[in-house]
Amino acid sequence: MHEMSLCEGVIEIIEREAQQQNFAKVRTVWLEIGALSHVEPEAMRFCFSAVSHDTIAADARFEIVSVPGAAWCMACAKTVPLKQRYEPCPDCGGHQLQVTAGDELRVKELEVD
């Protein structure tokens, strides 16, 4: 379960921002998770509640923003939707695709006190 180490990284980001921005409590964490990132949202929820215990984010709401997958098809010269990495272009069936969205995992926003 790599989600545990990912959540530990999220806590590190939050603590670093708390020092830099001078806040003492996190009310809400918004995390963007791309459809192609191989991260399970429910596992992230579980792991975040486990690793945030005894931190400034202990009682924070954990909101997940889902980012759909998309890629640039070189053959079609346009952006196409992707449900899974390495699937063919839904329009031409080609495999010359460059992922443009959906592989991210990032802290989008924090609501703090």
From Swiss-Prot:
Chain sites annotated for binding Zn(2+): 73, 76, 89, 92
Superkingdom of the source species: Bacteria
Molecular function terms from GO: nickel cation binding; zinc ion binding
InterPro entries with a match to the protein in the record: Hydgase_Ni_incorp_HypA/HybF_CS, HypA/HybF
Pfam families given in the database record: HypA
Gene3D superfamilies assigned to the protein according to its UniProt record, in alphabetical order: 3.30.2320.80
Keywords, comma-separated and alphabetical: Metal-binding, Nickel, Zinc
A Gene Ontology biological process term: protein modification process
PANTHER family, per the entry: HYDROGENASE MATURATION FACTOR HYPA (PTHR34535:SF3)
Cited function: Involved in the maturation of [NiFe] hydrogenases. Required for nickel insertion into the metal center of the hydrogenase.
Family statement drawn from the similarity comment of this UniProt entry: Belongs to the HypA/HybF family.
Name of the protein this chain belongs to: Hydrogenase maturation factor HypA
Name of the coding gene: hypA
